[in-house]
Amino acid sequence: MQRGIDSFFKRLPAKAKSAEAENGETPSKAPKRRKAVIISSDEDEVVSPPETKKRKASKTASSEDDVVAATPEPIAKKARNGQKPALSKLKRHVDPTELFGGETKRVIVPKPKTKAVLEFENEDIDRSLMEVDLDESIKEAAPEKKVHSITRSSPSPKRAKNSSPEPPKPKSTKSKATTPRVKKEKPAADLESSVLTDEERHERKRASAVLYQKYKNRSSCLNPGSKEIPKGSPDCLSGLTFVVTGVLESMEREEAESVIKEYGGKVMTVVGKKLKYLVVGEEAGPKKLAVAEELNIPILSEDGLFDLIREKSGIAKQVKEEKKSPKKEHSSEEKGKKEVKTSRRSSDKKEKEATKLKYGEKHDIAKHKVKEEHTSPKETKDKLNDVPAVTLKVKKEPSSQKEHPPSPRTADLKTLDVVGMAWVDKHKPTSIKEIVGQAGAASNVTKLMNWLSKWYVNHDGNKKPQRPNPWAKNDDGSFYKAALLSGPPGIGKTTTATLVVKELGFDAVEFNASDTRSKRLLKDEVSTLLSNKSLSGYFTGQGQAVSRKHVLIMDEVDGMAGNEDRGGMQELIALIKDSSIPIICMCNDRNHPKIRSLVNYCYDLRFQRPRLEQIKGKIMSICFKEKVKISPAKVEEIIAATNNDIRQSINHIALLSAKEDASQKSGQQVATKDLKLGPWEVVRKVFTADEHKHMSFADKSDLFFHDYSLAPLFVQQNYLQVLPQGNKKDVLAKVAATADALSLGDLVEKRIRANSAWSLLPTQAFFSSVLPGEHMCGHFTGQINFPGWLGKNSKSGKRARLAQELHDHTRVCTSGSRLSVRLDYAPFLLDNIVRPLAKDGQEGVPAALDVMKDYHLLREDLDSLVELTSWPGKKSPLDAVDGRVKAALTRSYNKEVMAYSYSAQAGIKKKKSEAAGADDDYLDEGPGEEDGAGGHLSSEEDEDKDNLELDSLIKAKKRTTTSKASGGSKKATSSTASKSKAKAKK
């Protein structure tokens, strides 16, 4: 059996040795003793050095006495006599807790005579004792390490030859690392703070309150814009963290933070160990300064920040060189002079070195000759001024240009054309391959080219192509005579059309929004173009024959509106039907009501926005050609701000390049595009959390003003379909807060509409858009719905109107109000009319007619009664009546019931002349001109009464021009006759 661990530590009995002696076994020699040093895991592994002969006698004696004291008396005597005792007699009982760790011995300290100032709990006392023990152990361990370092610093001569002398640096670093831990006395600080009196605490609170009031009432920057912000390299401050405190001299704090972020730095709010620099202005926070001094964080001023940007971007050296050198004008001639001067100086230096090598230092006469040969610096400058203009031009210009130099006027015109052109026109694509986002076999460019190249083959009149299915994907457009290119602006629709026409050799005739495109113009001018021949190739001198191949391009078709373009869309559709040439139409909004009728006659090609990477490559190539340095990240920001608009992105880059001192911050302000968002997109941005990351308060408020009438309705309709971020327990509280905000916004809108207080619109934007978006910030869980309030409001208005009409019609026989008619009369009236029709059929028609006659109801009032009494999910009572019975009721009603005064068919349209009908007799009796005037009015009245057009029950044909002329002649003769009679009486 195996022995237990306790058996190794038990003391052996004395009989064991006697037994061995009796058996005659010789005892084995005691092995040499070795020291085992136990090292804790917390301390460094320090190996004790071997014992040396220089040890003091007192220490050896004391150690020997301890060993002898631990052994029995006979063994101690042998040890004193110099004899080695047996191993078995030296063994003593060992407690396992001493080897494997056990309870620590408690030190009993006498109680203090005076009481402590504060009474601590047991945990606080234990912490303080542990920290004191640690401090003492660290202090005691330090001299031991020094001793070890001294012993190790004297190596053996063999090792000294092989090893290189290295100073014991790791020991010193360890000791240094431990020193700050000793200095930190957190419990002492806690004691001091806890010992503070009430007066001191009050003083601290008062001081902090004063500092907070100073912070609230702090002034802005002292001299805004007085210092120029250095233009550093991008990401020159990457990896550095900053904290800005106080009021700077020429910048606001937010402006300084934005400058740091532009160059790749990170801005923090709290001073900590990870902080690299603290930027300080006036009235800086004292706590931040104290913590920065404690952690040895470098403190910078505003000028120090600018110097750091220059230093990190390598501008400091250039600035020093510019200060040393005098100011010179930056002209092309001086640049050439500098280049030539440097070349001549280098050649002079080479000549000097060659002369030194040839002649050496001994030949003084040769040196004097060389010095005399050199001319004065003024003469060299005059000579050099004449040299560069010839040498540089000769190198650049080829021989052909020398023989036939261009005239200065033509050269100037060409340069002016190139320089004055906008970048959009200067760098527009010249071939189909250069169009952005239109590569591949399935692109719209390929489809348009295929359709246009086969147009004359498909429409030659021999065989009519078959109309394709509206949902066909692989339609090549052979049936259509026109093509419709639709898509957002600035993505290359017009460029695609013009380049495809040019590639196939067609001549284009273009009409855009600046031209009048009315029905008359299209009929007179465009219709003649559809059958004409083109002479453009003949006049341009391209050697082409007169061609019949030309294309009509109608740009911005959705803009054909107003009086100028009245009837233009219908005429364009008629021209497409009978056209003998291809027509290419372009529009931005394909869902426009006018375009829906045009789509049925056109080959539909929808253009999508190019991807950001495609536009980025094009713009970076333009920047390289124009020698404009801009970071790719900045280009991506501009493209995203313009909503992937190629034209506007290029215009923004050109605007940035126009200013040489344009910083990246100014570029951010320029790179904005006002987009017209629909209500669905606005609601999505109001509630989506991802959109809120890059939006300020002003941006959130601007969403409301895209359509301030519909925006609150969309928010109210869809806020319950949003799942907000955060804890699910807070969802109901957020919904309640959103409902309160919407109700307050509705009150503000009521005040705006009632009192025309339009200055309250920003307040309504806060309650109706910003607050609901903040409370319910998350993501949509369903589809965005159209506001149901609009439909319900129109339905309630319609029912109120129908109830008012019923109340007016039945007012002769009833005495109730409009509400009583709707609630009490309407169900029973409808039941009395419909029940005989449903039971008896056509025989019940007279009974139904009697009820309608008694209450003076119209035939349309029956439908109004059905609508007022029916509820959602309830069937109409007229559904049980046969259709033939309904028709019989309508016929009998039209025959028997006379038209009421309020019926739609009754009455004749009145004119203002009828108001003077009562005074006609008096006008006839009056003398003189009044008599003539009265006769004139009476004749007009008679004609109005006889005019059948004014009777609503009779549909008369329009009177011809001849009848109007005859009527006019009669009126003229009667008026002249009356005038002659009046003159005769006089």
Curated annotation (Swiss-Prot):
Pfam families in the cross-refs: AAA, AAA_lid_RFC1, BRCT, RFC1
Residues found modified as Phosphoserine: 18, 28, 40-41, 48, 58, 62-63, 128, 137, 149, 154, 156, 164, 194, 938-939
Q: Which stretches are tagged as biased composition: Low complexity? A: 962-979
UniProt region (Disordered), positions on chain = 1-95, 136-203, 317-388, 913-986
For this entry, list what GO says about its biological process: dendrite morphogenesis; DNA repair; DNA replication
Spell out the subunit comment: Interacts with C-terminus of PCNA.
Q: Where in the cell is it found?
A: Nucleus
Give the record's family classification: Belongs to the activator 1 large subunit family.
Q: What does this protein do?
A: The elongation of primed DNA templates by DNA polymerase delta and epsilon requires the action of the accessory proteins proliferating cell nuclear antigen (PCNA) and activator 1. This subunit binds to the primer-template junction.
Instruction: Return the GO cellular component terms, semicolon-separated.
Output: DNA replication factor C complex; nucleus
Q: List residues, modification Phosphothreonine.
A: T60, T71, T197
Domain BRCT positions: 232-322
Biased-composition ranges, Acidic residues, are 917-932
The organism's lineage is: Eukaryota, Metazoa, Ecdysozoa, Arthropoda, Hexapoda
* Predominant location: nucleus
Annotated positions binding ATP: G487, P488, P489, G490, I491, G492, K493, T494
Q: Could you give a GO molecular-function term held by this entry?
A: DNA binding
**Annotated source species:** Drosophila melanogaster (Fruit fly)
Q: Which Gene3D superfamilies match?
A: 1.10.8.60, 1.20.272.10, BRCT domain, P-loop containing nucleotide triphosphate hydrolases
Q: Motif (Nuclear localization signal) spans which residues?
A: 955-959
**SMART domains to which the protein is assigned, alphabetical:** AAA, BRCT
Q: Which UniProt keywords apply?
A: Activator, ATP-binding, DNA replication, DNA-binding, Nucleotide-binding, Nucleus, Phosphoprotein, Transcription, Transcription regulation
Q: What protein is this chain from?
A: Replication factor C subunit 1
Query: Gene that codes for this?
Result: Gnf1
Q: Give the compositionally biased regions (Basic and acidic residues).
A: 136-147, 317-364, 370-385
